[in-house]
Regions:
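Flexible "cap/lid" loop of the alpha/beta hydrolase fold
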Residues: 89-127, 163
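Gly/Ala-rich beta-loop-alpha elbow adjacent to hydrolase catalytic centers
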Residues: 76-80, 84
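Active-site catalytic motif of lipid deacylating hydrolases and related acyltransferases
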Residues: 2-72, 110, 116-128, 210, ...
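Active-site nucleophile elbow and catalytic-triad environment of alpha/beta-hydrolase enzymes
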Residues: 153-171
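Catalytic histidine-centered segment of alpha/beta-hydrolase-like enzymes
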Residues: 213-222
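Acidic catalytic loop of the alpha/beta-hydrolase fold
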Residues: 185-189, 215-216
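Short alpha-helix in the alpha/beta-hydrolase fold that links the catalytic acid
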Residues: 190-199
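Short beta-strand/loop motif that positions the catalytic acidic residue
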Residues: 180-182
Length: 240
């Protein structure tokens, strides 16, 4: 089997660093390439993007910097899943090949992104209290005042991206398999919503459920998540 690049996108407030531990578990033929959203981590000096369109364009630049052709897959968790969906269409619009697989984790289908509750306009303290209740951001961030000072603007902006996101129908249907990861104790994404992902690809959609797992199963059960990524890529009909 040929080598495959795996591009990964983090959840709200997250950075590319959350994926570094994956390297010890990924198969040898998979090269990990975490994508850093602007305004955090290795791109902390860059301004935050205020729209999903700008955020995706900013993610394309590090993608194309490393992509030299060949097989690739994309993984995104939560907000990162919506970004991954938009990014793959942006990549295709710029003349690159279809990915060999897409992994959407803890993520509603793009046409079902929820705008029922708007949080990013709340004062900081009220905002933080609400997202802790929702389970939409790791609680550890809010136990450290220094981290809060750094990450609150980032997290609020990520919520802005999601809450102002409006799905636009695409010119194409994807032709790669989609794998969905879901924690059955996730109170942000309901399992029955995941069926709507099927219409976005002509290929098979597989759903993997993590029992008694909340929205952050991607951290707590990362070895299992990576195991399924390895298994999926191993099963693809790719000739080296």
């Amino acid at each position: 089997m040929s080598n495959i690049s795996l591009y990964c996108l983090p959840y709200s407030g997250g950075s590319a660093a959350m994926f570094y531990k994956w390297r010890s578990v990924l198969s040898d033929n998979i090269t990990l390439r975490p994508l850093e959203p602007a305004g955090r981590g290795t791109r902390i000096r860059q301004p935050l993007c205020l729209t999903m369109v700008d955020a995706v364009a900013a993610l394309y630049h590090p993608f194309v910097k490393h992509y030299t052709g060949g097989d690739y897959a994309i993984f995104g968790h939560s907000l990162g899943g919506i970004m991954a969906f938009e990014l793959v269409h942006y990549i295709l619009d710029h003349g690159h090949d279809m990915p060999c697989a897409l992994f959407f984790s803890g993520c509603r289908p793009p046409d079902r992104a929820s705008h029922e509750v708007i949080l990013h306009t709340l004062p900081d303290q009220a905002f933080m209290e609400e997202i802790v209740k929702l389970g939409g951001t790791p609680v550890d961030v809010f136990r450290n005042k220094e981290l809060m000072t750094i990450f609150t603007p980032i997290i609020k902006n990520d919520y802005r991206l999601y809450e102002q996101y409006v799905f636009q129908a695409k010119a194409r249907t994807l032709t790669c398999p989609i794998v969905l990861f879901h924690g059955d104790a996730d109170n942000l994404v309901m399992q029955d919503e995941l069926l709507a992902w099927e219409k976005f690809t002509t290929r098979k959609t597989r759903t993997i459920i993590f029992p008694a797992a909340d929205h952050f199963f991607v951290d707590k059960h990362f070895e299992q998540v990576v195991g399924y990524v390895n298994q999926t890529i191993e099963s693809l009909e790719i000739v080296g």
